[in-house]
Amino acid sequence: MERMIEVCAGSYQDCIAAYQGSAKRVELNSALSVGGLTPSVASLVRVKKETDLTVICMVRVRAAGFCYEKEDVEIMFEDAKILLDHGADGIAFGFLNEDGTICEEDTKRMIDLIHSYNKEAVFHRAFDVTPDAFEAIETLIDLGADRVLTSGQKAKAMEGIDLIKVLNNQYGDKIQILPGSGMNAENAKMMMNYTGVYQVHSSCKSYKADATTTKTVSYTHLRAHETDSYL
């Protein structure tokens, strides 16, 4: 299996940079400062028009956790359909119950929608807050998910590398395991060699100053080093 890095992109510009760097697949988001939200349709359309990247689109209506109100769920399904109609090659999503277990009803419904377009269904790092990784991954396999993005239920994937290895050894022939969080050029090879996975997910981010940001008007809550930066 050919090894690859999926680039986590926060904008059209990020996708172009990834493409110029020979990336083959991106996960397109907005608002990476809060972990990634649903991107604009226009950014997807422009990326598909100008590149041959495989584009997985995040569908996440808000920041924070992954247990949603009914209205938010319906909005995410509408977003997913619109993105798929406009060329998305897959959708990254995650639905949990209040107890942290996978919401099987909404997850199955989303997988079926994505597969009706013959595209990839990717369960994102909501997986990492489930109480039982093995029960969760078996649920995803039973529901038909194609891939799961995971840091091995730790803050960073290298911290969860042993669980990632076990998951790949036990389930890698049934679902793709995609390690993500803290992955970079220095540790990607070690992750692949140790766990047996053939792909990793990395944001490869850099920061760009925006002269219009100020310290007297706050638009969001950012970590200190991002206060004057655009992601």
Region spans (language model):
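Active-site-adjacent beta->alpha loops and helix N-cap segments on the catalytic face
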Residues: 34-50, 98-113, 130-135, 155-168, ...
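Glycine/small-residue-rich loop that forms an oxyanion/phosphate-binding "nest" at active or ligand-binding sites
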Residues: 55-102
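Glycine-rich phosphate-binding active-site loops on the catalytic face of alpha/beta enzymes
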Residues: 27-34, 93-97, 147-157, 198-214
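Glycine-rich beta-to-alpha transition loops that act as phosphate-gripper elements at the mouths
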Residues: 7-12, 58-66, 74, 125-132, ...
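Glycine-enriched alpha-helix->loop->beta-strand junction motifs that scaffold or abut catalytic
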Residues: 22-26, 51-52, 87-89, 141-147, ...
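Conserved small/polar residues in nucleotide/adenosyl-binding loops
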Residues: 220-227
